[in-house]
From Swiss-Prot:
This is Cell wall synthesis protein KRE9. The gene is KRE9. It comes from the Eukaryota. Keywords: Cell wall, Cell wall biogenesis/degradation, Glycoprotein, Secreted, Signal. Residues 1-21 form the signal peptide. It holds the Pfam family Kre9_KNH1_C. Its main location: secreted. It comes from Candida albicans. One of its GO terms (cellular component) is extracellular region. Belongs to the KRE9/KNH1 family. InterPro entries: Kre9/Knh1, Kre9/Knh1-like_N, Kre9/Knh1_C.
Length: 271
């Protein structure tokens, strides 16, 4: 039996979480079933590159892929991954067929972890949807294979997009940008006084369209905003604190009792 690795969530906390758009796993599908009754379960994993070609997370910049079969998380919040099926392999295409030996795992629900290293030193981790393995004969005491909930979130580390982005990208109006990654202008601070007497639109209006059916991958995966190129100044407010009230009054002094005239009463009976 393969010795599986326990990946602790406490270690994952150190990884910077952000919107990760490089590996968009298209198969296996959620709930899909694969059988190992022939001696092994053969599964083709496919994915798309949903990032821009000029992005550091484009798969054109990928160095190696590590693919592991995982399950969980356990009641302690840990995921369980077997020894990698693919170890830091350079994959030219966007698919890889893996074989899972029949005697390595029991029947149950699993997902793939795809760990990608990039030329700039960055890394990403992606998880496929859960699928079901049947016809397996591996030991049942070590893996939590009954979990059917959501898989862990995608993760990325080592991509300082705010500093590596082309500064010219921030000068293009947002509505005119077309890439998966968009660039917003730097946030400005308000002035000390208002001098304008009329208002005007800073940018022209743009059309809005809505999806009529469920869409596939997002049109925009991430928006990058540059840091401030200035230092915001602040000052202490030396105004005295307002004193507590010195007079209280009962509510009855501010409430008057409702009255109705005799003529109004008679009119109500006649109506």
């Amino acid at each position: 039996m393969r010795q599986f690795q326990i990946i602790l969530i406490s270690l994952v906390v150190s990884i910077i979480r952000c919107v990760v758009a490089d590996v968009d796993i298209t198969s296996p599908k959620s709930g899909e079933t694969f059988s190992g009754s022939s001696g092994s379960a053969s599964i083709k994993i496919t994915w798309d590159d949903s990032d821009d070609s000029d992005s550091p997370k484009s798969l054109d910049n990928a160095k190696g892929y590590t693919i592991s079969l995982c399950t969980g998380p356990t009641s302690d919040g840990d995921i369980q991954c077997l020894d990698p099926l693919v170890k830091n392999e350079a994959i030219a295409g966007k698919s890889k067929t893996v074989s899972i030996p029949q005697n390595s795992v029991p029947n149950g629900y699993y997902y793939f972890q795809i760990y990608v290293t990039f030329t700039n030193g960055g890394t990403t981790i992606h998880y496929s949807p859960r699928f079901k393995l049947t016809g397996m004969s591996g030991p049942t005491a070590t893996l939590d294979v009954t979990e059917t909930g959501s898989v862990p979130a995608d993760q990325a580390s080592g991509f300082d997009t705010a500093t590596t982005a082309d500064s010219k990208s921030f000068t293009v109006p947002y509505t005119l940008q077309t890439g998966k990654t968009r660039y917003a202008p730097m946030q400005m601070q308000p002035g000390t006084k208002v001098t304008a007497t009329t208002w005007s639109m800073k940018f022209p209006t743009s059309a809005v369209t809505y999806y009529s059916t469920k869409a596939g991958t997002p049109n925009v995966a991430s928006t990058i905003t540059p840091g401030w190129s200035y230092t915001a100044e602040s000052a202490v407010n030396y105004a005295s604190v307002a004193p507590y009230p010195t007079y209280w009054y009962p509510a009855s002094e501010r409430v008057s009792k409702a009255t109705i005239s005799a003529a109004t009463k008679r009119r109500r009976w006649l109506d």
